[in-house]
Amino acid sequence: MQSNQVNLNLLLRRNWQKIEALQINLRHLNSVRFHMKESFGHRMAKCMLCHLLWQKGHFFVTEHPINGSVCDVLDLNTFIVYEVEAEATPSRIKRKLDDYRHPLIEDLIIIDLRKMGLSWEPLLDVRDAIDKASGLRFTEREA
């Protein structure tokens, strides 16, 4: 835990001007936040991406506004925006590139779920088991 605090202090010292200029609320640091219209697959991919960043010792924010658009994940160590897309069409990719063009953003990485050919069924089974054990009783099975 202490090394994580040291890493955070270094991050803040090195990147404070960028963090301040982008109006990043550190209250939501390393917290995964969702947009209400995101699909189950989108939310799971975002969670996994954030987990991978966290494992690498990176700090991130989610659902952060940049140029009037809201990005899925912003890595505060690299200032790379990650966007999870169900269908990354050429026009959609161009729009994302335009949306997140900002002098403080280093890059944009689009994770196209369609190209990955993933099946969320195993995770849905885990969700259903947790649902049953917790008593939450979700009735729909969304994919």
Region roles according to the model:
Residues 37-65:
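Metal-dependent nuclease catalytic cores that hydrolyze phosphodiester bonds in DNA/RNA
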Residues 52-56, 76, 102-106:
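Alpha-helix C-cap/termination motif
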Residues 63, 83-85:
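Acidic-residue sensor for enzyme active/binding pockets
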Residues 67-68, 90:
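Short coil/turn segments at the loop-to-beta-strand junctions that recur within blades
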Residues 68-82, 101:
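Active-site beta-strand-loop-beta-strand hairpin of nuclease catalytic cores
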Residues 47, 86-142:
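Catalytic cores of nucleic-acid endonucleases
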Residues 1-48:
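Interdomain/boundary linker segments immediately adjacent to catalytic/signaling cores
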Residues 1-13, 130-143:
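Intrinsic disorder/low-complexity detector
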